[in-house]
């Protein structure tokens, strides 16, 4: 993996995240203009769908990046030491980018009422008792 692949993957996640935030904005504007209307509920449902799609896609990509990194460290991918170091650096950067994107999506969704607090615990994968 190199900088070119990293940029391509980041552009992909940025595009999906931008679309998700646009739907969030439609929902927020509708609520501010008219309150809880049918259109607001429709936009909220759409925002929830976009959020789930983004989180699932990012999670799958993070799993693939993690598996590739493990293969690299286990020696299943045969490259020189310098190339291994560079690949590990870009894999780690990409993984962290996807992770921070997921955290941002969850925070924005929680702040704007797209998901409820108990749903946030499920999405993050924790239990309310564990987070104390």
Predicted segments — roles?
Residues 1-34:
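Short terminal alpha-helical segments
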Residues 5-6, 21, 38, 80, ...:
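Residue-level detector of intrinsically disordered/flexible regions characterized by low predicted structural confidence
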Residues 7, 107, 121-123:
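Ser/Thr- (and often Asn-) enriched beta-sheet segments in non-cytosolic proteins
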Residues 19-20, 39, 103, 122-126:
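Serine/threonine-rich, low-complexity intrinsically disordered segments
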Residues 27, 76, 114, 121-123:
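Generic short N-terminal amphipathic or hydrophobic helices
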Residues 33, 37-116:
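Acidic, low-complexity, intrinsically disordered interaction modules
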Residues 117-132:
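Short acidic DE-rich linear segments
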């Amino acid at each position: 993996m190199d900088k070119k692949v990293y940029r391509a993957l980041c552009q992909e996640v940025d595009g999906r995240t931008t679309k998700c935030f646009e739907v969030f904005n439609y929902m927020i504007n509708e609520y501010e203009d008219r309150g809880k209307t049918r259109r607001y509920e429709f936009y909220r449902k759409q925002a929830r769908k976009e959020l789930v799609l983004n989180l699932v896609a990012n999670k799958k990509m993070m799993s693939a990046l993690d598996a590739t990194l493990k293969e690299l460290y286990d020696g299943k991918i045969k490259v020189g030491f310098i190339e291994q170091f560079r690949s590990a650096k870009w894999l780690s950067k990409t993984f962290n980018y996807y992770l921070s994107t997921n955290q941002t999506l969850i925070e924005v969704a929680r702040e704007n009422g797209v998901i409820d607090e108990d749903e946030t615990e499920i999405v993050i994968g924790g239990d309310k008792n564990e987070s104390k």
